[in-house]
Amino acid sequence: MQLQTTYPNNNYPIIVEHNAFEELSEYIQDYDKVFLIIDEYVDFNFKTKFMPFLESTHIYKIIVPAGEKMKSFEHYQQTLEHLLEYNLTRNTCLVAIGGGATGDFTGFLASSLLRGVDFIQVPTTILAHDSSVGGKVGINSIHGKNLIGAFYRPKAVIYDLNFLATLPYDEILSGYAEVYKHALLTGQVAVDDIEKHFSTKEKLQSLNDIDQFIFKGIKAKLNVIIKDEKEHNMRKYLNLGHTFGHAVEYKTKIPHGHAVMIGIIYQFIVANTLLDTQFDISYYANYLKKLHYPVQIVQQLNFDDMYHYMLTDKKNNGEGIQMVLLEELGKPRVCHVEKTILIKAFNDLQLVLK
C-alpha cells in the first residue's frame, strides 16, 4: 500500500508493505552523505539487511540506544557533534531505522542540523506506525515527555512489515495501544472488529491480520494531520489517553503504549463523571488484563505526581488540565477537567485496576 500526503507543498510518500525496505535505495541515491541512525536492537536482529548500503562510501551507520532513554539532551548533543565531524552539507539525509523513539530523535536531529536536512522514517515497530506519520519530532525534558521538539516532515515513510516478525510481546503490546486508540476514535464497529481479532494474548501475539489494522490506523491519522498538521484543533484528538498516559510513562518508565492504555481507562472514568457517559469501565479494564498489560502498576502511583506531570501537557491552556474524552466511541472532544474530578478518577482507577 502506498499513500501520499496532500499538503499544498512538501508532500511525502508513505509506503506500507512487506519488503518495503528495498525501496530505500531509490530515495537516498542523490545525497552527498547518508546516515542510517539505527536502534541497537534492530541492528542486532537485521544487521545483514543493512550491509549492502554500507558498501557505498557515502553511507554511514550510527547505532543508538533503543527506547526513550535515547531522547535526552546528552544523546542529542553527542550525536549532533558526531555528525558534524563529517563536514556535512545540506545535501545530507538521516534515515531513522527503529521504533518511535528513534524516529522522534532522528527527526529532531535533522530539523536542527545545519538548520534543517532531510530525513526518512523507516519504522520497525507497531507503535511507530503512528509516530512516523505526521512530522512530530523531539526529545524529552526533565520536566516531561516530548516537551522539546518541532513539526518537521520526513521526505518519505518506508514501513517494511517484515520488521514486525521479531518483536517481543512487550513491544507488540505497546504498539497495539495506538492501533486500538484509532479504533476508539473511529467508532463502535471498529472497536468490535479489533477486539474480535485480538481477544486474547495468544491472538495478539500471533499478529494475524495486524496489517489491516495498521493500514486503517495510518489512513485515519493521515486524514487528521492533513487538516490540522500543527495540532490546533482536531489533531489533539489523537492524544486520546495520552494526558494521563504520558504522566504514567514518565514516572514509571513503562513502555509508551502500556501507559497510554492505562490513560485510556482513566479518560473513560473521567468521561463518565464529567460528560455523564455510561462506559463500562470494568469491561475495558478486563480487556487490558486479558492481554496482560501491567495495569497493577497504578497501585504504585500517587495522584500528586500524576497531577504535576499532567500540568506539563502541551494541550493545556490557562484554564488548566485539558483532556481528550470520548462522548461516545468515535466522538472525541477536548474538555477542561477540574482537579477534584481528576482525583476521584484516579482513586477509581486504582480500584478497577487492582
From Swiss-Prot:
Cofactor note: Binds 1 divalent metal cation per subunit. Can use either Co(2+) or Zn(2+).
One GO BP: aromatic amino acid family biosynthetic process
Principal location: cytoplasm
Positions that bind NAD(+): 100-104, 124-125, 136, 145, 163-166
Keywords assigned by UniProt, alphabetized: Amino-acid biosynthesis, Aromatic amino acid biosynthesis, Cobalt, Cytoplasm, Lyase, Metal-binding, NAD, Nucleotide-binding, Zinc
Cofactor(s), by name: Co(2+); Zn(2+); NAD(+)
Location within or outside the cell: Cytoplasm
EC numbers on record: 4.2.3.4
Keyword Transcription regulation tagged: no
Pathway membership: Metabolic intermediate biosynthesis; chorismate biosynthesis; chorismate from D-erythrose 4-phosphate and phosphoenolpyruvate: step 2/7
Molecular function as annotated in GO: 3-dehydroquinate synthase activity; metal ion binding; nucleotide binding
Annotated Zn(2+) binding sites: 178, 242, 256
Statement: the UniProt record of this protein carries the keyword Zinc: yes
GO cellular component terms attached to this protein's record: cytoplasm
Catalysed transformations (reactions): 7-phospho-2-dehydro-3-deoxy-D-arabino-heptonate = 3-dehydroquinate + phosphate
Top-level lineage group: Bacteria
Pfam families found in the cross-reference section: DHQ_synthase (PF01761), DHQS_C (PF24621)
UniProt cross-references to NCBIfam families, sorted A to Z: aroB
Job of this protein: Catalyzes the conversion of 3-deoxy-D-arabino-heptulosonate 7-phosphate (DAHP) to dehydroquinate (DHQ).
Family: Belongs to the sugar phosphate cyclases superfamily. Dehydroquinate synthase family.
Protein name in UniProt: 3-dehydroquinate synthase
Source species: Staphylococcus haemolyticus (strain JCSC1435)
Gene: aroB
